[in-house]
Amino acid sequence: ELVTDGYPADLTFDNDDKTDQNFTVHLKHRLTPVNPTDPQTPGAPINPDEPDGPKWPTRTNYDKTVHETVSYVDQSGHVVAKQHTDSVNFTRTVVVDNVTGEVITSGAGTTAWTATNGDTTFDAVVSPVVPGSVANKAQTAAVTDLNADSADVNETVTYTKVGSLVPSSSDGHFPGAATVVYPNDPSDATKVTPAGVPTVPGYTAHDPEGHVLTPGSRYQPSDPTKDTTITYTADQQTGSVSYVDDTTGKTLKT
């Protein structure tokens, strides 16, 4: 880019071949601001007449995005809920030297990295409730003070199948009862709520510590991923014999 050519406006060329006339021409490198609004064509030659010359810079020089991904999987790595994704974008203006292709990041014409909408935070993410399973964390923590050089955030929440109340009895006449899967806590993916203890007529239920569980009661397991054995014992049976006079119909003795 021409600055001055050293050629006076009133100069007259002479006809003396033996005397040089000297002029000093001042040139400077042309500088072009580049940003997401005016990105030029990344990778294309700055000077179309020089296809092997300097190229316009890649977009990451002035436009960066930090990504967050939270995956929800079971113990085998199978997806159990939709991924959570988020992103924070940063932009700036750089200046490109049209002669060398150098990307200038400070000084006249440049701007510092700025977060879109001023957002530099990934909010905490509450883990979704997955029926029949519990998560190893109720939420992923917030990530604050992100900048253009921050690494992507990748989190994994692992789910484990919930346990059940398992009825059991050593009594040979025990009719059996269905297992009861622990209900999920709808407000916390890491917890279950108390499970209803099956009622079996003629039998009394006991928890693993031997405590009697009344009919219709509910039991809160200490570990939501472990089965709990509920032991049933036969109730003591009582009977009576009455003696009746066939003639009078009166009860003589009980």
What are these regions (language model features)?
Residues E1-T254:
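Extracellular modular ligand-binding repeats in secreted and cell-surface proteins
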